[in-house]
Amino acid sequence: VKVGRSAVAMEAAHSHTGALAGRYEVYRAAFKKAGVIELSGYEEFISACKAMSILKKTVPGRRVMIITDGGGMGVNIADACASLGLEVEPLPEKAKEQLSLLLPRFCSVANPMDLTGSATDELFAEALEKTLDTGGYDIAIVAALWGPPALTDELAHLISEKAELANKPVIICSPGGVYTRAKTALFRKYGLPVFPSPESAARAASIVCRGGRRA
């Protein structure tokens, strides 16, 4: 986290860091050239620590796939991703055709993908596998709201398996209370980072994508 980016902050930084203070543009260019991931503040720093310590990988692109069991949550995540420069691209025709054969008609076969309140562990897993395999996406955000009665503790294991098979990072977004926190502990058990809001999940995805790009 580079402080002293504005003129006022730069002046204040001189009294604390001395020689490390200077024109922000110079540091930014040096960071990019060296492959340093620049963070905008402590919220992003916390997201970076959580995502990178668990995933231990970055990606060179910025195309993100969003899969959820609640349409509104998918839209919120898409907005958060777009505001950070991530690309929420439409599903390619090949992936759409394959998923249309697998998923119930009432599911939204798009990006974001809404599996609705009828989602099952298997539907989440199949959707993730097909989109990462044929969609050309670099990273996925899976938002399980735990409303659908057919979701079980096996979901975390299945999502982890598909992420490992595709060799691509998957981030979990799962807002909620005590019940949800107990469920999301299962994702962490299987090596998947969990974030409590669309904004924090999108921040984590942005950091993973930024880490794989050079100037």
What residue spans do the PLM features occupy?
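Glycine/threonine-rich flexible loop motifs
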Residues: P149-E154
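Peripheral docking tails and interdomain loops at the edges
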Residues: K2-T68, G72-V88, H157-A215
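Short glycine-cluster motifs
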Residues: E11, P60-D138, A143-L145
